[in-house]
Curated annotation (Swiss-Prot):
This is Myoregulin. Changing residue 29 to A: Abolishes interaction with ATP2A1/SERCA1. Induction: Expression is regulated by MYEF2 and MYOD1. It comes from Mus musculus (Mouse). Inhibits the activity of ATP2A1/SERCA1 ATPase in sarcoplasmic reticulum by decreasing the apparent affinity of the ATPase for Ca(2+), thereby acting as a key regulator of skeletal muscle activity. Its high expression in adult skeletal muscle, suggests that it constitutes the predominant regulator of ATP2A1/SERCA1 in adult skeletal muscle. Also inhibits the activity of ATP2A2/SERCA2 and ATP2A3/SERCA3.
Amino acid sequence: MSGKSWVLISTTSPQSLEDEILGRLLKILFVLFVDLMSIMYVVITS
């Protein structure tokens, strides 16, 4: 699937499967980033 068709699908149906998967991936990446930052903070301050 090309980027243009993906944008077209995501704009016409926000509740599409691709958007749900992308949202979950972004949530997981954000959680991992926060965990990494907290671990780095503990390592630096200890």
